């Protein structure tokens, strides 16, 4: 019984490794990718470093421009 459980656990870990789990959004490894996505967004103003109005949630971590 225990050997069957061990084999099943091994197969599951091979099929679904723990590194395949996505990182949380606040992890430093994720932030450069989000900044790059912000800069590619059509409403992102690169000179001011913020999103123009209307500031969509898809603009990511960038702040909304005040005016």
From Swiss-Prot:
Its main location: secreted. Residues 1-20 form the signal peptide. It is found in: Secreted. The cysteine framework is III (CC-C-C-CC). Belongs to the conotoxin M superfamily. Mu-conotoxins block voltage-gated sodium channels (Nav). This toxin specifically inhibits mammalian Nav1.8/SCN10A sodium currents (IC(50)=2.11 uM) without inducing a shift in the current-voltage relationship of this channel. In vivo, shows potent analgesic activity in a mice hotplate analgesic assay. In addition, this toxin has better analgesic effects than Ziconotide, an analgesic drug. Keywords: Cleavage on pair of basic residues, Disulfide bond, Ion channel impairing toxin, Neurotoxin, Secreted, Signal, Toxin, Voltage-gated sodium channel impairing toxin. Residues 21-48 form a propeptide. This is Mu-conotoxin TsIIIA. One of its GO terms (molecular function) is sodium channel regulator activity. Expressed by the venom duct.
């Amino acid at each position: 019984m225990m050997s069957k459980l061990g084999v099943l656990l091994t197969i599951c870990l091979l099929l679904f490794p723990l590194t395949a789990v996505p990182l949380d959004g606040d992890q430093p490894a994720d932030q450069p990718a989000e900044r790059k996505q912000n800069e590619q967004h059509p409403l992102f103003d690169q000179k001011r470093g913020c999103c123009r109005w209307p500031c969509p949630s898809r603009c990511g971590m960038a702040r909304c421009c005040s005016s």
